[in-house]
């Protein structure tokens, strides 16, 4: 495995791979890798000649009161996991390499950001889109892999790739979960023992929503109520949002139809967790993510 921390070196290496006719799969991360990231790497490994993993905690996507300083970091652990899962190139730039001075140009996301996490995190997806635009130009991948746990991010990346004509295939990968259903997340380490015990209620609520839809429920209000009441009954968390919207456009719905995202975010004392489920209507089939 090659470890690179300079943009110029990374671009030269990627050009070499392209000259050799090799396909490149890219997994962008902020590090502190877990089984969810490993699933992205494994999928990329199956589908490409070269797998590139980036580990970069992007300051642009953290708000003024968010956890940039305390976001978990352990590069040696990340390096070991990357090597175990067959990563060819690990790109690990410092913030000063990615942002050597004040930005002259920044990507501003105009749609799909006024709901879900975007509503309470102004500027977050602008930061995500800006760093991904830079990374896509640096890595020049054929495919980019993202976890559906952050379905809004996947929707934003879908728009970024389409609107900026990046020659990249977006590959969404289903959420990896603990045995009790809790979505894998780097932020799970912040949970207290009691919060960790309560946290699977998020996915239980989403599964209850899916069961209600399978049973014929089509009211978005009814689904929101069901999810909210389940979480309130089984956790001490503060609910940030429960949303029912179209996917990937993230338009609000009154009546469920087409591809529907049911998404939830809650705040425990020291961690904010998100989860979602994607439903395909009118068929009873559903894709759990």
From Swiss-Prot:
Pathway: Cofactor biosynthesis; (R)-pantothenate biosynthesis; (R)-pantothenate from (R)-pantoate and beta-alanine: step 1/1. ATP binds at residues 30-37, 147-150, 176, 184-187. InterPro entries: Cyt_trans-like, Pantoate_ligase, Pantoate_ligase_C, Rossmann-like_a/b/a_fold. Its EC number is 6.3.2.1. CDD domains: PanC. The active site is at 37 (proton donor). Beta-alanine binds at residue 61. One of its GO terms (biological process) is pantothenate biosynthetic process. Pfam families: Pantoate_ligase (PF02569). GO terms for molecular function: ATP binding; pantoate-beta-alanine ligase activity. One of its GO terms (cellular component) is cytosol. It catalyses: (R)-pantoate + beta-alanine + ATP = (R)-pantothenate + AMP + diphosphate + H(+). Belongs to the pantothenate synthetase family. Homodimer. Catalyzes the condensation of pantoate with beta-alanine in an ATP-dependent reaction via a pantoyl-adenylate intermediate. This is Pantothenate synthetase. The gene is panC.
């Amino acid at each position: 495995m090659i470890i690179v921390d300079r943009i110029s070196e990374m671009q030269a290496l990627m050009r070499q791979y392209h000259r050799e006719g090799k396909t490149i799969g890219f997994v962008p991360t902020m590090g502190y890798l877990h089984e969810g990231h490993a699933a992205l790497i494994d999928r990329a490994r199956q589908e490409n000649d070269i797998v590139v993993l980036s580990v970069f905690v992007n300051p642009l996507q953290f708000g003024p009161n968010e956890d940039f300083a305390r976001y978990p970091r352990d590069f040696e652990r990340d390096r070991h996991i990357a090597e175990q899962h067959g990563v060819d190139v690990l790109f690990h730039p410092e913030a000063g390499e990615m942002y050597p001075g004040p930005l002259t140009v920044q990507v501003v996301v105009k749609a799909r950001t006024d709901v879900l996490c975007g509503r309470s995190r102004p500027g977050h997806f602008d930061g995500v889109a800006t760093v991904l635009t830079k990374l896509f130009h640096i890595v020049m991948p054929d495919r980019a892999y993202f976890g559906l746990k952050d379905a809004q991010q996947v929707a934003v990346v879908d728009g970024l790739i389409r609107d900026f004509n990046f020659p990249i295939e977006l590959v969404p990968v289903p959420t990896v979960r603990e045995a009790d259903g809790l979505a894998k997340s780097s932020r799970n380490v912040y949970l207290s023992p009691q919060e960790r015990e309560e946290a699977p209620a998020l996915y239980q609520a989403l599964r209850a929503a899916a069961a209600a839809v399978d049973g014929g429920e089509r009211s978005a209000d009814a689904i929101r109520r069901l999810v909210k009441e389940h979480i309130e009954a089984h956790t001490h968390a503060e609910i940030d949002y429960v949303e029912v919207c179209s996917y990937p456009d993230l338009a609000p719905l009154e009546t469920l139809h087409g591809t529907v995202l049911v998404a939830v975010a809650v705040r425990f004392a020291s961690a904010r967790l998100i989860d979602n489920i994607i439903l395909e209507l009118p068929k009873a089939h559903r894709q759990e993510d």
